[in-house]
Amino acid sequence: MEDIYKIAVSGISDAELKEALLKSLEGRTLKKVLIIPPDFTRFHSQAGRITSIYYHLLTERGAQVDIMPALGTHEPVSKAQWEIMFKGIAYEKMLVHDWRHDVVKIGEVPASYLEEITENLWH
């Protein structure tokens, strides 16, 4: 049986990551982008590195890019944490979402509609 996995010894290089992210932008003209990476509690996921590279690729193409860390129930990302995780991105680019106070219900998606658009994959 052929192995369907590969053990990485060195991880993905910045060049490989940039190449993959560039490929995702091919044929697209993006004006406004919101990136929602995990917060500092997931630092080791490398999401900050991915976000930073994506941010610079997008802004070089003229896109307005905002970043809103997905806090879940955690505290907002501090400036010190931001500078470690999201290297090269100004702290002011972060949109802080106050999950305790600023979540407003604007409607409800009926289950029947979800079933229809997902061809019964979601119930």
What is each model feature region?
Residues 19-34, 61:
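Glycine-rich phosphate/diphosphate-binding loops that line cofactor/substrate pockets in enzymes
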Residues 32-44, 66-72:
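Short glycine-rich or small-residue beta-strand-to-loop segments that form or flank ligand, phosphate
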Residues 43-62:
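Histidine-anchored nucleotide/phosphate-binding helix
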Residues 77-123:
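An acidic, phosphate/nucleotide-engaging active-site surface
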Residues 1-15:
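N-terminal amphipathic/basic leader segments beginning at the initiator methionine
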Residues 38, 54-56, 63-67, 82:
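An N-terminal, globular interaction/scaffold subdomain
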Residues 61-73, 93-101:
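A generic structural motif
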Residues 31, 60-61, 70-73, 88, ...:
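Small-residue-rich
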